[in-house]
C-alpha cells in the first residue's frame, strides 16, 4: 500500500527509538511536522534559531549516546545550523540533520530562498565539508534507504553528523510501505571499529616490556560506552591513566590510577608523570592541541 513519505519517516524514527527532534518550523517541512503531530512517541522541540537546535541535538547525543535529530527549513535555516553541526563533527557526535528544500519541480527557477550559486538546489553543499555524508533526495522512493543509511553512518565507526536535504514535494509523495519495511529488519544495528588481533598482540607486548607505561584516554571512550572496559583494563594491568578534556568521566577522577587531565588545563603532576612514560597507549583520542599543550615536547 502506498502511504505518505512523511508519515513513514515518523514511523521509522519511532522504531529507531528517537525521542526528540530539535528544530524550527518552515514551509518546506510542514508535511513532516504534520506527520510528527500525530506521533505519540516523538516530541518536537522548537527553537528560535536553528543554531540552538543543532547544539541541543549535539548535547542530547552526548548524553544519550545516540544520534540527535535536527529538522530545519531551507536556505537561511540550514545555514544557521553550521556552527552546531561543525561542533558535532569535530567532537565526533552523531547527528542526523533533515533539511527541507525547494520543491523539485522548481529546481533552477530561482524560487524563494533556493541555494543555487553553483548549481540548482545545492544547499546540501553548505554542510558537505563538515558532515560524514550529505544526500539530496531526488527520488521519493530512495528516502527509506537514505534515511536508514544516514543513521547507520552517523552512529558507526567514528560518529558524526550527516545531512539529508529533502525537496518539499518529497515529504508529500506517496511510496509503497514495503520500501520502508525492508529497513526495519536490522536498522538498529551499527558497525563499530575493531582492533585486529595482531595489533592487539603488538600493543600488549609493548606494554609488558615498558618500564613506565601510561594509558591516555579521550572522549572516544565515552562515545563507545567503554568506560567499564577501560576501568577493567587499567586495573588488570595496574597501569596509570591520564585523560583529555573530552575524556572527563571515562574513569572517575578519584580512581587511584587516574593521573588527571593533560594539556592546556592539565595538572603539573600529570605532565611530569606522562613526560617520564616510555610507552603511552592512546585510546579514543586524537592527541589534539589542547590536550598536548600544542604538542610541546615532554607533555
Q: Where is each model-derived feature located?
A:
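N-terminal alpha/beta PP-like core and its mobile active-site loop of ThDP/TPP-dependent enzymes
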Residues: 1-299
Amino acid at each position: 500500500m502506498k502511504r505518505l513519505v512523511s508519515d513513514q519517516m515518523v514511523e521509522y524514527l519511532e522504531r529507531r527509538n528517537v525521542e526528540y527532534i530539535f528544530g524550527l518550523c518552515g514551509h518546506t517541512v510542514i508535511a513532516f511536522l504534520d506527520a510528527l503531530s500525530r506521533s505519540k512517541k516523538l516530541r518536537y522541540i522548537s527553537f528560535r534559531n536553528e543554531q540552538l537546535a543543532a547544539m541541543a541535538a549535539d548535547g542530547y547525543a552526548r548524553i544519550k549516546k545516540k544520534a540527535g535529530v535536527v529538522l530545519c527549513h531551507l536556505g537561511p535555516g540550514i545555514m544557521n545550523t553550521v556552527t552546531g553541526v561543525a561542533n558535532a563533527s569535530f567532537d565526533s557526535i552523531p547527528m542526523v540533520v533533515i533539511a527541507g528544500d525547494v520543491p523539485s519541480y522548481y529546481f533552477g527557477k530561482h524560487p524563494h530562498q533556493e541555494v543555487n550559486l553553483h548549481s540548482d538546489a545545492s544547499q546540501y553543499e553548505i554542510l558537505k565539508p563538515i558532515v560524514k555524508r550529505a544526500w539530496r533526495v531526488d527520488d521519493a522512493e530512495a528516502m527509506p534507504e537514505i534515511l536508514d543509511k544516514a543513521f547507520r553512518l552517523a552512529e558507526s565507526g567514528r560518529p558524526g553528523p550527516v545531512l539529508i536535504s529533502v525537496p518539499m514535494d518529497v515529504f508529500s509523495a506517496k511510496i509503497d510501505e514495503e520500501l520502508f519495511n525492508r529497513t526495519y529488519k536490522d536498522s538498529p544495528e551499527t558497525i563499530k571499529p575493531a582492533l585486529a588481533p595482531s595489533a592487539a598482540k603488538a600493543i600488549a607486548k609493548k606494554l609488558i616490556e615498558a618500564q613506565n607505561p601510561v594509558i591516555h584516554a579521550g572522549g572516544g571512550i565515552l562515545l563507545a560506552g567503554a568506560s567499564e572496559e577501560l576501568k577493567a583494563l587499567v586495573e588488570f594491568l595496574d597501569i596509570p591513566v591520564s585523560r583529555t578534556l573530552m575524556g572527563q568521566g571515562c574513569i572517575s577522577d578519584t580512581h587511584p590510577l587516574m593521573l588527571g587531565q593533560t594539556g592546556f588545563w592539565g595538572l603539573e603532576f600529570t605532565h611530569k608523570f606522562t613526560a617520564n612514560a616510555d610507552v603511552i597507549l592512546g585510546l579514543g583520542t586524537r592527541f589534539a592541541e589542547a590536550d598536548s599543550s600544542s604538542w610541546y615536547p615532554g607533555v
